[in-house]
A protein has these predicted regions:
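Conserved, mostly hydrophobic/aromatic
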Residues: 78, 176, 257
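Hydrophobic "anchor" residues on beta-strands that sit immediately upstream
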Residues: 74, 175, 253
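Short, well-ordered beta-to-alpha junction loops that form the rim of enzyme active sites
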Residues: 178-180
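A generic local structural motif
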Residues: 61-62, 176
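Glycine-rich tight-turn/loop motif centered on a GG-T
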Residues: 111-126, 130, 134-147, 216-231, ...
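Short, conserved phosphate-binding/catalytic loop or strand-edge motifs used
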Residues: 170-174
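Active-site capping/gating regions of soluble enzymes
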Residues: 1-59, 65-67, 83-103, 108, ...
């Protein structure tokens, strides 16, 4: 099973927007692209929204059937580990192996020494085709990389081989994720992480490193654009080298997590993947849930009241909602409007404050990030929330489709 060159993860917290998401992708594909939709949902999201992996499979299959989509599509068991993978085995065909929590864990001395010995041919000045400067590789560097990443790649191997036994070799896509950590992986670290994965028999088709800068949820990239550009291109060159040198799948590509709304770096990624003829996987989820709230606000009446209630409850539960996402949000509490202020907002004011239009006078990234992590508030409302999604499906669907196509795919693929 092979992933298409270009793919987009389209998470959907409440499984009501699959058709609208797919419409956006089909619209982009009319330009000659072949973007594969990947419906992704994590175990944490399933727990918060009281759903099951089978619900995601049904949503994907139903959307594809309703719209007559003929391309490849996938269902991603997002951010799984050995303790959570089993419930996804039957319905997923794409597995994101999250091994970030194993970074820095101790490996046996003998394993580290064996890895260092296997890298002898790369010692000294290592030239990566296309890279401006050679990489300096020595035993100290390799020991540090092994100490940091060997346990994580071993964990990836254990999850992969469990899945291989359960599903059969070649019957699923493997992604390895190391993004939910504080410190970015450098291109030279990525190179030897890829060697470890190859040595351990993990045929990763996508890898999600932690990039330089901040990838906060639902808002634009924050960081040194010049540094990101350099590292992103070097990562792409490292992947090319790893395919030829280590025998990894030739279609391996970078996966960008928390990838929605990073408008300032989309042109950079587009330029680099075009220059080197490489693929890309962009993972999104919360941006669609935010469009549901925007759509409800635009509907007015009970929809607007629901949106205001969700914000009020989110503000009250702010600490517990933000805690699981501490590494990927930055909210200035002094910039959050009061519940009383929001009560007086019109549909347009609420939608414009939440919608990600950089430069719009009403746009508030703090408000947006809080709503982003507040989907549990809506989940706890149960049918009260989902009934309104169905009642206002047309306006919400239009918001979702516009967001994925106009603000994401058009920017990312220069449409």
């Amino acid at each position: 099973m092979k992933l298409e060159k270009y793919s987009i993860g389209i998470g959907d917290r409440f499984a009501h927007q699959g058709k609208a998401q797919l419409k956006a992708i089909m619209k982009a594909n009319q330009s000659g692209l072949n973007i594969a939709p990947v419906w992704n949902k994590s175990n944490r999201e399933h727990l918060y929204t009281h759903t099951h992996p089978a619900d995601v499979r049904k949503e994907a299959d139903d959307a594809v059937a309703m719209l007559g989509f003929k391309g490849k599509y996938f269902v991603d068991a997002d951010h799984i580990n050995l303790s959570t993978v089993s419930s996804f085995v039957e319905t997923a065909d794409f597995f994101t192996l999250d091994v970030a929590s194993f970074i820095g864990k101790e490996s046996r001395y003998e394993e580290k020494q064996a890895f260092i010995a296997s890298c002898e041919k790369y010692m000294g000045s290592l030239t990566i085709p296309g890279m401006e400067h050679s990489l300096e590789v020595n035993e100290t560097l390799l020991d540090r990389i092994a100490s940091k990443f060997l346990a994580a790649t071993q964990q990836a191997s254990e999850i992969y081989h469990f899945l291989k036994t359960e599903k059969g070799e070649g019957n699923f896509i493997t992604e390895v994720s190391m993004d939910e950590v504080e410190t970015p992986q450098t291109p030279i670290e990525l190179l030897f992480i890829l060697k470890m994965l190859a040595d351990k028999g993990v045929p990763a088709q996508t890898i999600a490193p932690k990039f330089t800068g901040r990838f906060n949820k639902g808002v634009d990239y924050k960081g040194n654009i010049e540094q990101f550009t350099k590292e992103f291109e070097e990562d792409v060159l490292v992947l090319d080298f790893a395919v030829k040198e280590f025998g990894l799948p030739e279609e391996i590509k970078l996966s960008v997590h928390s990838g929605s709304d990073k408008f300032s770096i989309y042109p950079i990624m587009a330029q680099v993947i075009k220059k080197h003829d490489k693929g890309l996987h962009l993972k999104t989820a919360g941006t669609t849930w935010l469009e549901e709230i925007i759509g409800l606000a635009m509907a007015g009446g009970e929809g607007l009241e629901m949106a205001k209630t969700i914000y009020a409850n989110a503000l009250e539960q702010k600490e517990q909602l933000c805690a699981p996402y501490a590494d990927v949000i930055e909210i200035d509490a002094t910039q959050l409007p009061s519940v009383e202020e929001v009560k007086g907002w019109s549909s347009e004011k609420f939608a414009n404050t939440l919608r990600h239009i950089p430069g719009h006078p009403d746009y508030n990234p703090n408000f947006r990030q809080l709503i982003h992590v507040a989907y549990k508030v809506a989940a706890d409302m149960g049918k009260q929330y989902t009934d309104l999604l169905e009642k206002h499906a047309d306006i919400i669907g239009a918001c979702v489709e516009e967001n994925i196509y106009e603000r994401h795919l058009k920017r990312l693929f220069n449409l």
